[in-house]
Amino acid sequence: RGEPGIVFELKTADRKRDLNARVDEAFAQIRDRGYYEGMEGRVILVGMAFWKKVPCVRIGSA
């Protein structure tokens, strides 16, 4: 079993109000491109977007 796998996708936003849309795009990219395929066991998916130093994070599982 071991530790879970973790997949990150990072995006930047030009405006603070775009953070939620960009984090959704990051998360969708992980799923659409199947970055977690072939990983065994539990896989944690992390979409992150940044505007300057302000983060927005979405976490899910495969």
How does the language model describe each region?
Residues R1:
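Active-site beta-strand termini and strand-to-loop segments that position acidic
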Residues P4-K16, R33:
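Conserved catalytic cores of phosphodiester-cleaving nucleases, focusing on short active-site segments
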Residues F8-L10, A26, I30, G47:
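Long, contiguous hydrophobic alpha-helical segments, chiefly transmembrane helices and signal peptides
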Residues V23-D24, G34-I59:
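Nucleic-acid nuclease catalytic cores
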Residues D14-D18, K53-C56:
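Flexible loop/turn segments at secondary-structure boundaries
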Residues K16-Q29:
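Active-site-adjacent loop/helix micro-motif of nuclease/hydrolase catalytic cores
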